[in-house]
C-alpha cells in the first residue's frame, strides 16, 4: 500500500517536470551548500583536538601598556617560567619553554634538506601528547644533543630504516642524535608546521639566550603549560596576572593563560581584550549557510503550497471515488517526501562534485564524512522534517474539503492566501541583496587597502635567509651578485619588508613625556637597504659609507617622526636605556611592513651587521628564471650545502590580504547561489501565476492587450516585492558591514552607490527571470487558452 503512494508521487513529479525541476534543483542547491558550510565549520572547530590534553593545555600570553595602547603578545621573558614554577607549582602539571619555529638545515650522510624546527624543553612532547613512533615522551629530549624528528623527515633521510640513535647534523655544525620519531601532526593542529624538535639545553648556549635568563624585558620566547587536573584557567590567570610587574614596571605586564581550544578561533586581541578571530567567520558563514538553506526551503514550500491550490478538484474526485482523508494525507506527504529525498540525494552528488572547488576557495583539504552516522542522521532528519512541513498544507488542509464543493470548483483561496508567499519572496531577496552588498563592501575594503601606498618598491624584490657564511663575507657576496648583471642592489636586514621582528620601548628624546612608553619597531640593516627596497627620503639623507658616524645613525619613518612631536627631528639625538646615543640623519615615508589595515608602527632603522635576511633587487627586463638561476649560483658558492629558499616580497605582501580575499570569494559564491535560488523560486511562482490567469490573459489579448502590457501585468507585483526587499536589506546591510569595517583602523567608507547597484542588480536579475515566463505566457494563442479554460 505504501509503495503505491510513492509510485503515484513519482508519476506526479514526472508529469509536472518544470515544477519538479525547480523544486528539486533549488532545494538540492541549498542543501548542498549547507553541507559544504557544515563540513567547513566542523573542520574549523576540530583544530587542535588531535592533542589528547587539548582541554588542559595553554600558552602564557602578556598584555603590556605602551602609552595609551595595550599590546598583546605570545612572546614572554625567559625568567617567567621559574617564577611561575616557584610560586604556583601546584597549578601546573607541566611547563615547557620553546623558541619560535624557523627553518634549519639538516644533514644525514650527504643528504641535506631544510625543515622547520624549534628548540623545546623536554616536557614539550608530553604536554602535546605527540604520538611517538620511536622513542618515548619521557626521555626523548633529555640528552644535550637529542633530536626528535617527524615521520616524514625520517622517511626522507632513512626510508624504512630505524633512525633511532643515528647522527644528524643541523645548522651545518651541530652533531645531534635522533632519540625519537613522532607521527606527522595533522594540518588542523597549530603545530602542524613543526617537523623537528631540538634540545633546549643547546639553545641556552647561545649568547643572546644566556643573557635573557634574568632579563624580564626581553620577550622573545614561548611558554606552554598543562594545568593540573583540578585547576581552572581563569583562577590561575587571576593569580599570575601581576607576577612580572615588580621586575619590569615600565610596561606594566599582565600575564594570562590562553587555552589551546581558543588558539585557532580566538587569536585576535584589541587593546588587551580578546576580539575574536576566525570564530567571526564560523558564525558568519554558519548564518549564511542557514539563510541559503532557508531560501531553498522557502522556494519548496512556496511552490508546493501554490501548486496544491490547483488540486482541489483532484481531491474532490478522489473522495467521490471512495478515498478517505487519511489516504489523501499520506499521498500528499509521500509526494513531498519524494521531492525532498530526491533533492537530498542530488545534493550529495553536488557536494562531491563541488568539494575540490570549495576546498580551493576556502584553502582547505576537507572531505565528506561519509562514515559518520551523525552526518546521515542530520541529513536524513532534516530532509524528513522539510518534507513533512512543506507537505502539511496540502495534506491537512486540502484533504479536509467536502467532495461536492471541490468538484463544483467553488473552492477559492482566501483573500490573504498569497500573503505568506509574498512575505517569503521578500525574505529571499532581502537575504540575496544583503549578500550582494556585503560582497561589494568586502571587495572595496580589499581594494582600498591594496591601493594604499606601501612606501617602497616590492617588484622584483626577493628575500632569502642569511647564513653565517654570507654574514661573514657579505661584501664579497654582494660584489659577486652585482657582477652577474641580473641584480641592481643587495642589502641585509634584521626583518623582512613585510614584518617587523624587533621592537623596543626604551628610547627617549628631547621633549618626550617620561610616562610615555611607545612600542617602536627596530630594524637593523646594511647601508644599501634603502636603495634595495626603494624607500623615499622626505627629509635628511640615506645611510652612506662616506659618513663614518653613520654607525650610530638612525632613520625614522613618518610615524616615528610624528611620535617625537618634531618635524625638525633630523640632527637631533635619540638615546636608549643603556645611554647609547643615536643621531637622526633622515626621515622616510611610511613603509607598510605589518598589516595594511592598521596604523603604521613608529619604526627606527639603524645600521648593523647582525642581519637575518638578504634583500636582492632583480634588474627589470631580465627574465626572472634566468635571474634566479644566476643568484642561486652565487648563493651556492658560499653555501654549497644549504638549499636556495627565497621569497618574493610582493607575493608575501599579497598574503596579508588572504583572509579578506577568501572572504570576498566565498561571499560572492554564496551571494550567487542565493540569488540563483531566489530566481528559481520566482520563476516557479510566475509560472504558477501565469497558469492561474490563463483565461484572463486570453481575454485581455482578444480585447487588444499588447505583449508588453501582459508582461507588466504578470511582473509588477513581483518587482514590488523585490523593491521592498531592497528597502529592508539596505539598513540591515549598512549596520552589519559598518560593524565589520570597525575592525580595521584603515578602512573604506560605505558608499551609497554600492547599495543602489545591489538593488538595481537584483531588480535586473528578477526582471530577466520574470520576463522569460511572462513573455511566453503573453505570446500564447488566446483562442487556444480560452478553449482550454
Labelled PLM ranges:
Residues 1-11, 15, 19, 51, ...:
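Membrane-helix entry/capping segments
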Residues 44, 58-113, 123, 155-160, ...:
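Hydrophobic, regular-secondary-structure patches
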Residues 42-65, 88-90, 131, 190-191, ...:
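Membrane-proximal juxtamembrane linkers immediately C-terminal to transmembrane helices
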Residues 38, 287-315, 389, 394-395, ...:
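A hydrophobic alpha-helix feature that marks transmembrane segments and, especially
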Residues 6-22, 26, 296-339, 400-411, ...:
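Intracellular coupling helices
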Residues 121-134, 147-280, 476-659:
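Mid-to-C-terminal secondary-structure elements
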Residues 32, 36-39, 256, 336-403, ...:
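Small-residue-rich transmembrane alpha-helices
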Residues 16-45, 418-445, 456, 681, ...:
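Short, strongly hydrophobic transmembrane alpha-helices
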Amino acid at each position: 500500500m505504501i509503495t503505491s503512494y510513492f509510485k503515484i508521487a513519482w508519476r506526479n513529479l514526472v508529469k509536472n517536470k518544470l515544477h519538479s525541476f525547480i523544486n528539486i534543483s533549488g532545494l538540492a542547491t541549498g542543501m548542498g551548500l549547507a553541507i559544504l558550510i557544515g563540513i567547513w565549520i566542523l573542520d574549523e572547530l576540530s583544530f587542535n583536538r588531535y592533542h589528547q590534553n587539548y582541554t588542559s593545555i595553554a600558552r602564557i600570553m602578556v598584555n603590556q601598556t605602551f602609552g595609551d595602547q595595550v599590546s598583546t603578545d605570545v612572546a614572554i621573558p625567559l625568567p617567567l617560567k621559574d617564577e611561575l614554577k616557584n610560586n604556583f607549582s601546584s597549578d601546573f602539571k607541566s611547563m615547557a619553554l620553546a623558541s619560535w619555529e624557523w627553518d634549519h638545515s639538516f644533514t644525514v650522510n650527504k643528504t641535506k634538506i631544510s625543515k622547520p624546527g624549534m628548540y623545546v624543553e623536554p616536557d614539550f612532547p608530553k604536554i602535546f601528547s605527540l604520538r611517538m613512533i620511536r622513542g618515548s615522551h619521557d626521555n626523548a629530549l633529555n640528552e644535550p644533543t637529542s633530536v626528535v624528528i617527524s615521520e616524514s623527515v625520517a622517511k626522507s633521510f632513512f626510508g624504512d630504516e630505524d633512525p633511532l640513535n643515528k647522527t644528524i647534523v643541523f645548522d651545518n655544525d651541530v652533531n645531534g642524535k635522533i632519540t625519537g620519531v613522532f607521527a606527522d601532526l595533522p594540518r588542523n593542529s597549530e603545530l602542524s608546521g613543526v617537523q623537528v624538535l631540538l634540545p633546549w639545553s643547546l639553545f641556552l648556549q647561545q649568547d643572546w639566550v644566556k643573557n635573557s635568563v634574568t632579563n624580564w624585558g626581553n620577550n622573545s620566547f614561548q611558554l606552554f603549560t598543562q594545568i593540573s587536573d583540578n585547576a581552572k584557567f581563569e583562577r590561575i590567570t587571576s593569580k599570575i596576572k601581576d607576577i612580572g610587574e615588580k621586575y619590569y614596571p615600565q610596561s606594566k605586564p599582565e600575564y594570562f593563560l590562553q587555552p589551546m581550544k581558543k588558539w585557532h578561533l580566538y587569536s585576535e586581541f584589541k587593546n588587551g581584550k580578546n576580539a575574536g578571530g576566525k570564530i567571526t567567520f564560523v558564525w558568519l558563514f554558519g548564518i549564511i549557510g542557514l539563510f541559503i538553506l532557508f531560501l531553498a526551503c522557502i522556494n519548496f514550500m512556496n511552490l508546493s503550497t501554490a501548486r496544491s491550490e490547483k488540486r482541489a478538484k483532484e481531491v474532490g474526485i478522489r473522495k467521490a471515488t471512495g478515498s478517505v482523508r487519511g489516504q489523501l494525507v499520506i499521498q500528499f506527504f509521500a509526494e513531498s517526501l519524494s521531492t525532498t529525498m530526491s533533492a537530498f540525494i542530488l545534493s550529495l552528488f553536488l557536494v562531491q562534485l563541488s568539494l575540490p572547488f570549495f576546498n580551493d576557495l576556502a584553502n582547505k583539504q576537507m572531505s565528506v564524512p561519509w562514515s559518520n552516522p551523525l552526518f546521515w542522521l542530520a541529513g536524513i532528519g532534516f530532509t524528513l522534517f522539510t518534507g513533512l512541513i512543506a507537505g502539511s498544507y496540502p495534506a491537512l488542509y486540502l484533504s479536509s474539503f467536502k467532495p461536492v464543493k471541490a468538484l463544483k470548483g467553488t473552492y477559492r483561496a482566501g483573500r490573504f492566501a498569497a500573503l505568506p508567499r509574498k512575505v517569503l519572496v521578500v525574505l529571499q531577496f532581502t537575504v540575496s541583496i544583503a549578500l550582494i552588498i556585503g560582497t561589494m563592501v568586502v571587495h572595496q575594503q580589499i581594494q582600498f587597502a591594496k591601493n594604499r601606498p606601501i612606501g617602497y618598491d616590492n617588484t622584483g624584490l626577493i628575500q632569502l635567509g642569511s647564513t653565517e657564511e654570507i654574514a661573514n663575507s657579505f661584501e664579497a657576496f654582494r660584489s659577486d651578485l652585482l657582477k652577474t648583471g641580473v641584480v641592481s642592489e643587495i642589502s641585509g636586514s634584521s626583518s623582512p619588508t613585510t614584518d617587523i621582528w624587533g621592537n623596543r620601548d626604551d628610547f627617549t628624546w628631547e621633549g618626550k613625556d617620561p610616562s610615555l612608553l611607545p612600542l617602536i619597531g627596530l630594524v637593523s640593516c646594511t647601508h644599501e637597504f634603502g636603495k634595495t627596497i626603494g624607500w623615499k627620503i622626505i627629509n635628511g639623507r640615506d645611510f652612506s659609507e662616506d659618513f663614518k658616524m653613520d654607525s650610530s645613525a638612525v632613520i625614522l619613518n613618518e610615524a616615528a617622526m610624528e611620535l617625537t612631536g618634531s618635524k625638525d627631528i633630523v640632527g637631533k639625538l635619540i638615546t636608549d636605556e643603556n645611554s647609547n646615543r643615536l643621531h637622526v640623519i633622515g626621515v622616510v615615508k611610511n613603509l607598510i611592513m605589518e598589516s595594511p589595515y592598521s596604523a603604521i608602527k613608529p619604526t627606527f632603522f639603524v645600521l648593523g651587521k647582525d642581519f637575518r635576511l638578504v634583500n636582492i633587487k632583480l634588474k627589470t627586463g631580465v627574465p626572472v628564471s634566468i635571474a634566479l638561476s644566476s643568484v642561486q649560483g652565487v648563493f651556492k658558492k658560499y653555501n654549497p650545502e644549504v638549499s636556495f629558499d627565497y621569497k618574493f616580497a610582493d607575493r608575501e605582501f599579497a598574503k596579508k590580504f588572504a583572509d579578506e580575499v577568501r572572504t570576498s570569494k566565498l561571499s560572492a559564491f554564496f551571494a550567487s547561489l542565493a540569488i540563483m535560488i531566489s530566481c528559481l523560486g520566482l520563476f516557479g511562482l510566475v509560472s504558477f501565476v501565469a497558469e492561474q490567469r490563463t483565461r484572463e490573459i486570453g481575454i485581455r489579448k482578444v480585447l487588444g492587450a499588447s505583449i508588453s502590457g501582459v508582461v507588466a501585468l504578470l511582473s509588477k507585483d513581483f518587482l514590488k516585492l523585490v523593491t521592498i526587499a531592497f528597502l529592508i536589506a539596505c539598513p540591515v546591510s549598512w549596520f552589519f558591514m559598518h560593524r565589520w569595517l570597525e575592525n580595521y583602523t584603515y578602512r573604506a567608507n560605505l558608499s551609497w552607490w554600492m547599495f543602489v547597484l545591489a538593488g538595481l542588480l537584483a531588480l535586473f536579475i528578477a526582471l530577466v527571470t520574470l520576463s522569460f515566463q511572462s513573455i511566453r505566457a503573453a505570446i500564447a494563442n488566446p483562442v487556444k487558452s480560452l478553449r482550454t479554460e
